[in-house]
Amino acid sequence: MNFDNLEREDEQIAHLVQKEKERQENSIELIASENFVSKAVMEAMGSYLTNKYAEGYPSKRYYGGCHVVDEVEDLARERVKKLFGAEHANVQPHSGSQANMAVYFSILEPGDTVLGMDLSHGGHLTHGSPVNFSGRLFNFVSYGVDKETETINYETVRELALKHKPKLIVAGASAYSRIIDFKTLREIADEVGAYLMVDIAHIAGLVATGLHPSPVPYADFVTSTTHKTLRGPRGGLILCKEKFAKALDKNIFPGIQGGPLMHIIAAKAVCFKEALEPSFKTYMEQVVKNAHVLAEALESYGFKLVSNGTDNHLILVDLTNKDITGKDAEILLDSIGITLNKNTVPNETRSPFVTSGVRIGTPAITTRGFKEEEMKEIASIINDAIKEKDGDLEPLKARVKALCAKYPLY
């Protein structure tokens, strides 16, 4: 992209943008929630649409001059409904957290009981963490993973639901590497008369391409971000049954947001169009293949994988047997050009600022073109770095740079 105007107007920011570009180009990005957008998505984000205020919804705006952005939003809504087979879509949420908040406000009252996945077992802040608005406003009861299998025990979820009678059951996760059984969760919700919301922020790309079962036939509400496996701009979206559309829309605007970001909604529309192409399914298939190969390679070096593997795009690694914390592993690997994040593991004994594990994802490196052989090399580099953490890391930096040079960012 051309940054001539930025360089003229603000050298400091232009310099930092260039530095970040170089960091991305010369690093192996393994953060499971990150990806690289297409140039088309980036151009939409930087378009004239950023100038337009458009409170309200298409044909029901509080400002004039919205006829063009109405078409943009309509395109985004229709494309995402087609992508997921949904009855209604709202593409205005600025983030996944705000998408979840809008759903809660649509059907809950403060103090209502909700069943959600424990953050330390792979859930998300907005699924009831006490430090988040969700845990502060509502009475969340947490379910986790089974101590032995490290996967969701649906019978335990059923028992909790029967005991606590939640008004809403929240499914989905930010660090769970296995298939989620939405049909069974729907059955549990029906047993206790609860709504079902599924947060597919991490697996949206897999759901869209049929590589993970879709929650849309079972859930009352489905929320997501657009910037992880969907490979779009940073933002959120909500899908729901038509009967909830009116309540949902008014809880986005005027409920928790004012004007939508029309340049981001345009970029969302572009990413939905890209996701409808056959090439996107090919991409997502490679994401999953890469995750499987990387997981197997890490296991061959003695790394303990939570639930012993992965069905999706991410791997949760328990480093307890490697004599290193998640925090120290993150810092160590960052120093050689591999970016990932420390992460709690089931039955965590350390602080969330230290952790016993790391989370690894393959969407971003797959976008660059990395395939199975590169996964084996990445696993080897990670193993060598942790094994030689107090030694000379320069040869490992060179191996990272060699991989990055083979697959340019853009």
From Swiss-Prot:
Q: Which cofactor does it need?
A: pyridoxal 5'-phosphate
The residues annotated as site (Plays an important role in substrate specificity) are 227
Q: Could you say which residues bind (6S)-5,6,7,8-tetrahydrofolate here?
A: 119, 123-125, 351-353
Locate the N6-(pyridoxal phosphate)lysine modifications and list their residues. Answer: 228
Q: Under the cellular component aspect of Gene Ontology, which terms does the record hold?
A: cytosol
Query: Chief location of this protein?
Result: cytoplasm
- Reaction catalysed by this enzyme: (6R)-5,10-methylene-5,6,7,8-tetrahydrofolate + glycine + H2O = (6S)-5,6,7,8-tetrahydrofolate + L-serine
Would I find ATP-binding among this entry's keywords? no
Query: InterPro entries recorded for this chain?
Result: PyrdxlP-dep_Trfase, PyrdxlP-dep_Trfase_major, PyrdxlP-dep_Trfase_small, Ser_HO-MeTrfase, Ser_HO-MeTrfase-like, Ser_HO-MeTrfase_PLP_BS, SHMT-like_dom
Sorted UniProt keywords = Amino-acid biosynthesis, Cytoplasm, One-carbon metabolism, Pyridoxal phosphate, Transferase
Q: Which EC number(s) are documented for this chain? A: 2.1.2.1
| Key word Protease present | no
Matching entries from PROSITE patterns are given as:
SHMT (PS00096)
Gene3D superfamilies in the record: Aspartate Aminotransferase, domain 1, Type I PLP-dependent aspartate aminotransferase-like (Major domain)
Its pathway is:
One-carbon metabolism; tetrahydrofolate interconversion; Amino-acid biosynthesis; glycine biosynthesis; glycine from L-serine: step 1/1
Any one GO BP annotation for this protein? tetrahydrofolate interconversion
Any one GO molecular function term: glycine hydroxymethyltransferase activity
Location comes to: Cytoplasm
Return the NCBIfam families for the record. PRK00011.1
Regarding protein family, the annotation reads: Belongs to the SHMT family.
The record's note on quaternary structure and interaction partners says: Homodimer.
| PANTHER family given in the database record | SERINE HYDROXYMETHYLTRANSFERASE, SERINE HYDROXYMETHYLTRANSFERASE 1
Q: What does this protein do?
A: Catalyzes the reversible interconversion of serine and glycine with tetrahydrofolate (THF) serving as the one-carbon carrier. This reaction serves as the major source of one-carbon groups required for the biosynthesis of purines, thymidylate, methionine, and other important biomolecules. Also exhibits THF-independent aldolase activity toward beta-hydroxyamino acids, producing glycine and aldehydes, via a retro-aldol mechanism.
Name it: Serine hydroxymethyltransferase
Species of origin: Clostridium perfringens (strain ATCC 13124 / DSM 756 / JCM 1290 / NCIMB 6125 / NCTC 8237 / Type A)
Q: Which gene encodes it?
A: glyA
